[in-house]
A protein has these predicted regions:
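Regulatory sensory and allosteric helical modules in signal-transduction proteins
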Residues: 43-105
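A short, aliphatic-rich beta-strand micro-motif
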Residues: 110-119
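Short glycine-/small-residue motifs
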Residues: 114, 124-127
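Juxtadomain coupling helices with adjacent low-complexity linkers
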Residues: 126-165
Length: 165
């Protein structure tokens, strides 16, 4: 079952990197991903979180993809992965007040790692993320961004397989 495999991958990733939450954001057009059309919406399709963390997947459904524009740009400009520390959130607020409000006020997020999920035609089809309260507990020297990108590649393959069934 694809959902079980995805949850297992997210659980392992979340625990390995000591994150409070790990999730997969999928881009879509209404009810399905239509080939060769620009994506308009996104959902938090899969989510795994630590025991004391409240799920947010119910708050992240059918949102306009334009909200994630800065994240998508940063992912593309940074070889498929981007880290936002709480100290950089002010810069994000200047670039995209809507995204800042969504992350900070609606979801209460302060530190994130986003990695791009790519389809077989190398288009961005989604994002996998790790969420942290405090990066200082987990310095970047133990967070292997290359490994996160490798794991994202496995998640991409699972999403591609799901879209074919």
């Amino acid at each position: 079952d694809i959902s079980e495999k995805m949850q297992k991958m997210l659980f392992e990733m979340m625990n390995f990197y000591h994150a409070r939450r790990c999730g997969v954001i999928e881009f879509h057009n209404s009810t399905s991903n239509l080939n060769n059309l620009s994506f308009l919406w996104y959902d938090l399709s899969y989510e795994n979180m630590q025991r004391n963390v409240t799920p947010i997947s119910g708050k992240v459904k059918n949102l306009q993809l334009s909200i994630l524009s800065p994240v998508m740009t940063d992912i593309i400009d940074n070889d498929g992965i981007v880290v936002y520390r709480s100290s950089e959130m002010k810069t994000l607020e200047q670039r995209s007040p809507v995204l800042y409000d969504h992350l900070k006020n609606k979801l209460n997020v302060s530190n994130m790692i986003y990695a791009g999920l790519y389809g077989c035609n190398n288009n961005l089809i989604g994002i996998v993320f790790l969420e942290y309260n405090d990066f200082f507990k987990y310095p970047e020297d133990i967070i292997d961004l290359h490994d996160i990108k490798e794991r994202a590649s496995g998640i991409s393959q699972l999403l591609e397989f799901k879209s074919m069934i």
